[in-house]
Amino acid sequence: MEHIKNVIERYKHVRNMKMLQQAYQGKYAFVGIGNHSTNNLYPVLNYLHVPLKYICCKTPGKLHLIEGVFPHVRATTSLDEVLTDEDIKGVFVSVSSKAHFSIASRVLAHKKALFIEKPPCLNAEELRRLIELQKQTQVLAMVDLQKRFAPAMQILKKKLQGSKGTKTYNLKFLTGAYPEGDALLDLFIHPIDCVVYLFGKAEVRCVEPIDEHTVMLVLKHADAIGVLELSTDYTWSDAKESMTINTNKGIYSLEQMETLTFQRKPHRFCGLPLEKVLMHVNVTAELFGRNNFQPLMQNNQVF
């Protein structure tokens, strides 16, 4: 028993040292301090211990308030001050969509890594120019389409690579009314990005808008076809995001990016479903799920 305790303590020590050694080599800056940033992005940076040196905003009256909340950060209205600081290795940007292209261009031109809230620009020409600038400077640039990096999505991506034939899927993204912005660019872009990430480039086979709140889509990929319901005609108190994928091996179900399950299909003989003749026991395997009982990193929504 003493030997087992020593092994456990040794493991805990190694794990703790590994975490403490993961230090950042540079400083970072954040442009913008709106509601989305303070509610969603700053908490993640704090959780990851990202060393922010600057917070940049356009309102001088906010500067002393920002430094009161973030005592180790310099608040400024000058983007030039941020971009000319050699300590700054990367910049997070989350401001008005109209200002994204201008700020992103300047960040890339100064060869700083860029993480920018969607959309990074407002038209195809601006997007082309940003892509060219990123290629010229060879710096890391990323748009905030973070759902594709969720653990459940990563697992699902690997599982789908082992399936054969044409896959079919149904996706529902249902929220309440969204009068404060563009639902397509602010909300619906996330599920659309997810299916492109999972199945590759998509061809729009059918688009059916319903009033100004719902879009029904049929998308065709190289080896998959899916139906999407994207709507702001439901409720925020019970907003839903779910996907069901039918493959040759079985059925994958993804709920709220928090639960991923797999149900194997019953066998067939010469096209005949044996479950109609023999007893079939449905077995659902949980491939990913959060356990709120244990306060571990994997069970934290920030993770």
Could you tell me what each predicted segment is?
Residues M1-F70:
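N-terminal Rossmann-like dinucleotide-binding module
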